[in-house]
């Protein structure tokens, strides 16, 4: 939805009276902000004690305004762009009168408020710009274009990290017309690109890059590059690219800005060119993360936690794979027993009954049945990962394989989870959690399936499973494995 949420600053910190829980688990707190169609409240999950922000949307107003399609698109976009520098959508709920967006609560407020106090130091501005570019690049790789980037839509968490918010004006790649361009006029005047003003068609990726350039200028200068009391005069300056960098801007920064605020979108920097720029690269680290149990997990944080215990082993492990170094070394008590599948699980695994695609955008996957021990299956997955230089993460009977190469849609990430079918049979479900679909299919066909086909369990005879929902050809009479096709194959 394209409305502006106004922050409330004068409301009391505590609620004057207790309220009923929203859908049984959220305790509503103070009003954080409001717009034409929605109000945003601070809330607390009474089960986890976690603070969240809940956007409460008036259904009647949305219906009258014809904005249902906007709501659906915003939900779809927020589900698609899960990144440490993007405000996360946890869940969506609805009643007869209201729609609730349960979102990450970002405590630090708008970046705009920080810039309003004066220009930032170069290293601070660079950090925010790096995080902004990381987030926007991630969005574009998934076919999402923000189209309203500005400091008011950039929030800061308690650790001073940037979070991109407000995807109400965002577009997705399937909205592109036959000419390969977008045609909707949107955005905030001071941050809008010249080609949008021309009202001809525009490349939304290049429009976001222009906005990032304006934001960088504002962070470093403390004021807008294109400013005039008269809006039409400001538009003329934008269209002509008329701006001056202050004397305290370094030569490197000035050159970068000239490429970001290039009026010709064909000559404007692309994201790969930005990330190769010398000013941008200072102190930059690629953000590595993965999604587990519906939560974002930072790879760097895991490494730091393990660095003390691993430090003394570095010399002796120099010849070992990097996979072993990154993998958690907690192996007390052996592997737990896999979760057992009930009849409903087995039915959902059968072709035509798998509903996971309704909830998971990256639902591509395969399943196979094996009579081999869980430890042997996990070892085989680790072996495959080692050959292709993938990082391995293990938790109980789940294994995550993460590629090091930054593909078109980020690094390829594959999750494998093992379930108990019978005392001597397990089902292994393999899914793509991130990265390009073609790259995933190549990996499965050339690496995963050929190597797993040879997997056997010593001295184990698999017993038949009398469940009609499972394809008979998928139940082996020997310890060898057999792939069950998923609904995406």
Curated annotation (Swiss-Prot):
Its cofactor is Mn(2+). The activation loop within the kinase domain is the target of phosphorylation/activation by upstream protein kinases. The PPI motif mediates the interaction with the ABI (abscisic acid-insensitive) phosphatases. Residues 363-392 are annotated as: PPI. Keywords: ATP-binding, Kinase, Manganese, Nucleotide-binding, Phosphoprotein, Serine/threonine-protein kinase, Transferase. PANTHER family: CALCIUM/CALMODULIN-DEPENDENT PROTEIN KINASE KINASE-RELATED, CBL-INTERACTING SERINE_THREONINE-PROTEIN KINASE 12. The modification Phosphoserine is found at residue 170. InterPro entries: Kinase-like_dom_sf, NAF/FISL_domain, NAF_dom, Prot_kinase_dom, Protein_kinase_ATP_BS, Ser/Thr_kinase_AS. ATP binds at residues 32-40, 55. GO terms for molecular function: ATP binding; protein serine kinase activity; protein serine/threonine kinase activity. SUPFAM superfamilies: Protein kinase-like (PK-like) (SSF56112). It comes from the Eukaryota. It comes from Arabidopsis thaliana (Mouse-ear cress). Induction: Repressed in roots by salt stress. This is CBL-interacting serine/threonine-protein kinase 12. Residues 336-360 form the NAF domain. One of its GO terms (biological process) is signal transduction. The keyword Membrane does not apply. Its EC number is 2.7.11.1. Interacts with CBL2 and CBL3. The active site is at 148 (proton acceptor). Residues 26-280 form the Protein kinase domain. It catalyses: L-seryl-[protein] + ATP = O-phospho-L-seryl-[protein] + ADP + H(+); L-threonyl-[protein] + ATP = O-phospho-L-threonyl-[protein] + ADP + H(+). CIPK serine-threonine protein kinases interact with CBL proteins. Binding of a CBL protein to the regulatory NAF domain of CIPK protein lead to the activation of the kinase in a calcium-dependent manner. Expressed in roots and shoots. It is an enzyme of class 2 (transferase). The modification Phosphothreonine is found at residue 184.
């Amino acid at each position: 939805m394209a409305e502006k949420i106004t922050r409330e600053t004068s409301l009391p910190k505590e609620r004057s009276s207790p309220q009923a829980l929203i859908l049984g688990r959220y305790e509503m707190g103070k009003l954080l902000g409001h717009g034409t169609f929605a109000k945003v409240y601070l809330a607390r999950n009474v089960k986890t004690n976690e603070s969240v922000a809940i956007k409460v949307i008036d259904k009647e107003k949305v219906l009258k305004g014809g904005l249902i399609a906007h709501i659906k698109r915003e939900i779809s976009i927020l589900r698609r762009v899960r990144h440490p520098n993007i405000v996360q959508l946890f869940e969506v709920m609805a009643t007869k009168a209201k729609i609730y967006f349960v979102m990450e609560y970002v405590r630090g407020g708008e970046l705009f408020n920080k810039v309003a106090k004066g220009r930032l130091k170069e290293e601070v501005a660079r950090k925010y710009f790096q995080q902004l570019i990381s987030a926007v690049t991630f969005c574009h790789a998934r076919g999402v274009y923000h189209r309203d980037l500005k400091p008011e839509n950039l929030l800061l968490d308690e650790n001073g990290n940037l979070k991109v918010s407000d995807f109400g004006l965002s577009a997705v790649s399937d909205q592109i017309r036959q000419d390969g361009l977008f045609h909707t006029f949107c955005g905030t005047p001071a941050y809008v690109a010249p080609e949008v003003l021309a009202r001809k068609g525009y490349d939304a990726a290049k429009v976001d890059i222009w906005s990032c350039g304006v934001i960088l200028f504002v962070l470093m200068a403390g004021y807008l590059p294109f400013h005039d009391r008269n809006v039409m005069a400001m538009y003329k300056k934008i269209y002509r690219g008329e701006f001056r960098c202050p004397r305290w801007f370094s030569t490197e920064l000035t050159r970068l800005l000239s490429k970001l605020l290039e009026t010709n979108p064909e000559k404007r920097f692309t994201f790969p060119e930005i990330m190769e720029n010398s000013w941008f690269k200072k102190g930059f680290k690629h953000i590595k993360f993965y999604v587990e149990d519906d939560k974002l997990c930072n790879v760097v944080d895991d490494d730091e936690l393990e660095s003390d215990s691993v430090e003394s082993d570095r010399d002796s492990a120099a010849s070992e794979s990097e996979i072993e170094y990154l993998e958690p070394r907690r192996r007390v008590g052996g592997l737990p027993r896999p979760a057992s599948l009930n009849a409903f699980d087995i039915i959902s695994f059968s072709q035509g009954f798998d509903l996971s695609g309704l909830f998971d955008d990256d639902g591509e996957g395969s399943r196979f049945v094996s009579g081999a021990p869980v430890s042997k299956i996990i070892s085989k997955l680790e072996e495959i990962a080692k050959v292709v230089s993938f990082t391995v993460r293990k938790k109980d009977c789940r294994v995550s394989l993460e590629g090091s190469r930054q593909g078109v849609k980020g690094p390829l990430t594959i999750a494998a989870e093992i379930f108990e079918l019978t005392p001597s049979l397990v089902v292994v479900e393999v899914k793509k959690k991130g990265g390009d679909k073609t790259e995933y299919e190549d990996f499965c066909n050339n690496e995963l399936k050929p190597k797993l086909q040879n997997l056997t369990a010593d001295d184990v005879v698999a017993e038949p499973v009398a469940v009609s929902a499972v394809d008979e050809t998928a139940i082996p009479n020997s310890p060898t494995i057999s792939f069950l096709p998923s609904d995406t194959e």
